Design a protein with these regions (language model features):
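Hydrophobic aliphatic residues
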Residues: 27-29, 120, 173
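Residue-level marker of positions within ordered structural domains that often coincide
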Residues: 53, 101, 121, 152, ...
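Short histidine-centered beta-strand/loop micro-motifs
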Residues: 35-42, 84-86, 106-108, 158
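Generic protein-terminus/edge-of-domain signal
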Residues: 1-72, 78-79, 113, 124-128
Length: 180
């Protein structure tokens, strides 16, 4: 059994990748956590979740989601979140966690100020459920699946491919939020 470890302010104590490649791709099972849930925590990284099988009750700040097989979630930077087993059933999922600088490159770049901060600094946009019946949501789910495939057998240009996919996902999120 595992559990998330946090500081007193609930910030997760875990490295999500490293400075050179700030991405963590992690297959998970909710049943592997003590008592079938992971503790409330936050981190500066953005988190994309894809439900491989089963269901999970997922909380982000004050929002509750029921995530089912084939669905997913965008969890913004610095959002408090937790996940719980649903009706005692296991849930397998993939978590792709990455630092925002992986998208924008360097501090105060146009990519940061125009495209990344626009989303990460808006407290109203703490999360977004990727639904099965929304085409652009399913495009993102397929891209998360592509990242999963790449991680299983990393090709020579693995990091570059992951970067391009995450930038494409970010573009879709940006176009959604800029139209709000």
């Amino acid at each position: 059994m595992v559990q998330i470890h946090t500081e007193k302010n609930q910030k997760e104590i875990k490295r999500h990748g490293n400075y050179e490649f700030p991405v963590n791709i992690s297959p998970e099972s909710i049943q592997s956590y003590e008592q079938g849930y992971f503790l409330w925590h936050w981190h500066p990284e953005i988190e994309l979740t894809w439900i491989i099988s089963g269901q999970m009750e997922y909380y982000v700040n004050d929002q509750k989601y029921l995530l089912s097989e084939g669905e997913g979630l965008f969890g913004n930077s610095n959002t408090l979140h937790s996940g719980y087993m649903k009706d005692g059933q296991d849930c397998d999922y993939l978590s792709v966690t990455f630092h925002p600088r992986f998208i924008y490159g360097y501090e105060n770049s146009l990519l940061q100020t125009k495209y990344v901060d626009f989303i990460t600094s808006n407290e109203l946009w703490h999360s977004l459920k990727f639904e099965k019946d929304v085409t652009w949501h399913q495009d993102i789910i397929r891209q998360i699946q592509d990242i999963c495939q790449l991680a299983q057998e990393p090709p020579e240009d693995y990091e570059l491919q992951v970067h391009m996919i995450l930038c494409s996902i970010w573009q879709k999120l940006y176009l959604h939020y800029v139209s709000q």
